[in-house]
Amino acid sequence: MGTICVTGTASGIGAATKAKLVAQGHRVIGVDLRDADVCGDLSKPADRQRIVDEVNALCGGVLDGLVPCAGVSTPVPNELIVRVNFYGTLAIVNGLRPALEKG
């Protein structure tokens, strides 16, 4: 089985995805604001880069999959939705692309 990074693992779809992947025998690197292997705020550019760096360190630069489940929705401000759901996801996908290419 492979090593897979899942964002949003503290609750909801991210938590369920992590549980399913672990049950299938995968190693999961969870990312969330808290209660995760890598904790950080995807709305903040500095945290995005740190998350990428920490995931890369944990996976040894080789990642077999990425499931970006982290996200927010109303009633939070639209600006926060865009920062997390768009820019946060884009930064994680782009930042982990080299590790995914090796997996």
Predicted segments with their positions:
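N-terminal Rossmann NAD(P)H-binding glycine-rich loop of SDR-like oxidoreductase domains
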Residues: 10-19
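Cofactor-binding loops of NAD(P)H-dependent oxidoreductases
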Residues: 40-43, 70, 84
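Conserved hydrophobic beta-strands of the Rossmann-like cofactor-binding core
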Residues: 3-6, 66-67
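Conserved NAD(P)H cofactor-binding loop of Rossmann-fold oxidoreductase domains
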Residues: 67-75
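Conserved Rossmann-fold cofactor-binding substructure of NAD(P)-dependent oxidoreductases
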Residues: 43-60
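Active-site loop of short-chain dehydrogenase/reductase
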Residues: 2, 61-63, 100-103
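Rossmann-fold cofactor-recognition segment
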Residues: 31-47
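Amphipathic alpha-helical dimer-interface segment in Rossmann-like NAD(P)H-dependent oxidoreductases
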Residues: 79, 84-103
